[in-house]
UniProtKB/Swiss-Prot annotation:
<keyword id="KW-0479">Metal-binding</keyword>
<feature type="binding site">
    <location>
        <position position="270"/>
    </location>
    <ligand>
        <name>Fe cation</name>
    </ligand>
</feature>
<dbReference type="Pfam" id="PF14226">
    <property type="entry name" value="DIOX_N"/>
</dbReference>
<dbReference type="Pfam" id="PF03171">
    <property type="entry name" value="2OG-FeII_Oxy"/>
</dbReference>
<protein>
    <recommendedName>
        <fullName>Probable inactive 2-oxoglutarate-dependent dioxygenase AOP2</fullName>
    </recommendedName>
</protein>
<feature type="binding site">
    <location>
        <position position="336"/>
    </location>
    <ligand>
        <name>2-oxoglutarate</name>
    </ligand>
</feature>
<dbReference type="GO" id="GO:0016706">
    <property type="term" value="F:2-oxoglutarate-dependent dioxygenase activity"/>
</dbReference>
<dbReference type="GO" id="GO:0046872">
    <property type="term" value="F:metal ion binding"/>
</dbReference>
<keyword id="KW-0408">Iron</keyword>
<dbReference type="InterPro" id="IPR027443">
    <property type="entry name" value="IPNS-like_sf"/>
</dbReference>
<dbReference type="InterPro" id="IPR005123">
    <property type="entry name" value="Oxoglu/Fe-dep_dioxygenase_dom"/>
</dbReference>
<feature type="binding site">
    <location>
        <position position="325"/>
    </location>
    <ligand>
        <name>Fe cation</name>
    </ligand>
</feature>
<dbReference type="InterPro" id="IPR044861">
    <property type="entry name" value="IPNS-like_FE2OG_OXY"/>
</dbReference>
<feature type="domain" description="Fe2OG dioxygenase">
    <location>
        <begin position="248"/>
        <end position="345"/>
    </location>
</feature>
<dbReference type="InterPro" id="IPR026992">
    <property type="entry name" value="DIOX_N"/>
</dbReference>
<feature type="binding site">
    <location>
        <position position="268"/>
    </location>
    <ligand>
        <name>Fe cation</name>
    </ligand>
</feature>
<comment type="similarity">
    <text>Belongs to the iron/ascorbate-dependent oxidoreductase family.</text>
</comment>
């Protein structure tokens, strides 16, 4: 169970004197690096996302999920995991491609409201929220590269992650389902779980989904500047989940004191570069530390969780860790909303640690790879059985 005493580092990214080249920038940059080295994530204070915008994005999710199923089914897209999806009648998702571009968001709302001009308020809310989270992502990535002395690669790095294939995935879990899970879980969401729904149905569910689509109701919405992100706005509905699991490494706390667990998302690492996550009111996120302890992250206004992914770990030659984390909802009869951007390398970008990060003390840990190939392996039959995806896919044998 997540500890209430342990806390993630809290870093203020909205200080008025925080400008590149300033003493405050150097101070915060050092704090960001240490947090990512120690925890793989941190809590960012960023009051540039107004409380009004926070409430607007959550009201947007409520309005979208309240639409009839036949209306949501109008949301179609040829890309995998984008467009309307129903997941074993336990959750559903909507998707927007290139969600940083307002006209694309308008196309999405016009699918749902075809007899008018879509929904201008929803479109603008999604765009504004995506832009703010992208500001955090770009700032943190710049600080990371500067702190390791590879600032000469910053511009190329930002261009290599241009927001070209952004998506908005809205995922919801049916309320009061009462799901009991008995699973063999070895890595993260790669595990195949046998799910028995409390509504009397027996469902075999494959929980191997990508960063854009999380079984606990995450979001993915992309947008912004110079980065390929998926910004997610989603929900966790309290699904009264009991878990009895065998794990191959990172546990899902098997039957701890027979306590009912509300597991929205099994233990996993993200495969992308960075995730910037916003929890709205209902807590649930738990992060695993180096010494195998869980930190339960409590939501608060104007704070966002910045999480490093496997791709960043490889790019930085293992100097930054990608933390295992999960979602465990304990609130009763309440819906948990979250929103996040997932920054991913664009197609054909090869992830390789710069030569400046490789020396006798830090030998090369991972072979160069294309993010799409890593993701394909992650979802393959072989990949689903692997405990540590990144190491299994591209670790240097001598490392």
């Amino acid at each position: 169970m997540g500890s209430c005493s342990l806390q993630l580092p809290l870093i203020n990214l909205a200080d008025k004197t925080l400008e590149p080249g300033s003493s405050k920038w150097a101070e915060v940059r050092s704090d960001v690096r240490k947090a990512l080295e120690d925890f793989g994530c941190f809590e960012a204070s960023y009051d540039k996302v107004s409380l009004e915008l926070q409430e607007s994005i959550m009201k947007t999710m409520e309005e979208l999920f309240a639409l009839p199923v036949e209306t949501k089914q109008r949301n179609v897209c040829p890309k995998p995991y984008v467009g309307y999806l129903n997941h074993n009648n336990l959750s559903e998702s909507l998707g927007i491609s290139n969600a940083n571009i307002l006209e694309n968001i308008n196309e999405f709302t016009q699918q749902l409201w075809p007899h008018g001009d879509g929904n201008e308020n929803i479109s603008k809310t999604i765009q504004l929220f995506a832009e703010k989270l992208v500001e955090i992502d770009v700032m943190v990535r710049r600080m990371v590269m500067e702190s390791f002395g590879i600032e000469k690669y910053i511009d190329d790095h930002l261009k290599s992650t241009a927001y070209a294939t952004d998506e908005l995935n809205i995922v919801g879990v049916e309320p009061n389902v009462g799901v009991k899970v008995n699973a063999d879980i070895s890595d993260d969401v790669n595990a195949n779980a046998s799910v028995n729904a409390g509504v009397g149905a027996n469902v075999n569910a494959d929980t191997g989904v990508n960063d854009n689509l999380n079984v606990d109701a995450n979001v993915a919405v992309g947008g912004g500047v110079n980065a390929n992100t998926d910004l997610g706005v989603g929900v966790n509905v309290n699904s009264n989940v009991a878990v009895n699991a065998k794990t191959g490494g990172d546990d899902v706390e098997a039957n701890d004191d027979n306590e009912e667990k509300k597991l929205g998302l099994p233990c996993h690492t993200d495969k992308n570069l960075f995730t910037v996550l916003f929890q709205h009111e209902i807590e649930g996120l738990e992060v695993k530390t180096k010494d195998e302890k869980w930190i339960r992250v409590k939501p608060s206004p104007n704070t966002f969780i910045v999480i490093a992914g496997d791709s960043l770990c490889a790019l930085m030659n293992g100097r930054i860790r990608a933390p295992y984390h999960r979602v465990r909802v304990t609130e009763k009869k309440r819906t948990r909303y979250t929103a996040a951007i997932f920054t991913c390398p664009k197609p054909d970008y090869v992830i390789e640690a710069p030569k400046e990060l490789v020396d006798e003390k830090h030998p090369r840990l991972f072979r160069p790879f294309d993010y799409r190939d890593l993701f394909t392996f992650y979802h393959s039959e072989a990949g689903r059985k692997i405990q540590y995806t990144l190491q299994a896919y591209c670790a240097v044998s001598e490392a």
